[in-house]
């Protein structure tokens, strides 16, 4: 059984934060990272918001890392993408990506469901990866093949789903 933190319990039993409050919380989560990782993550988040218009953004500030999921609904199981941020890294996960055609071999991973592309790793950002035609094609194919399609004309919504009371440091040690 998963232990519920006081923040999770409060989130389930009270009024959810406004969009402005959720944005402030997300900003504080990102600020825990090294400045260059934070800046890269903010730029990546901005690009993803343009590529996945109208997504429900579900934020999990977990023990190990920060995760921002992009979904057509508020159901985590229907999310299509996520940005995952362990210390010193930013990774784009294709949450329904195992069957995506990838002739350029950009996707990493061998699991039955998820594939990923590392965007930032230990001080080596790839700021142009989300502009790469092969990666844009993968994103478009993932959107078109999603179990639940993104609703046309939907407005973006930011939801803080989980905040772990105990967390590992967000800055790389060393």
Residue ranges and their predicted role:
Residues 1-174:
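Charge-dense, helix-prone N-terminal extensions
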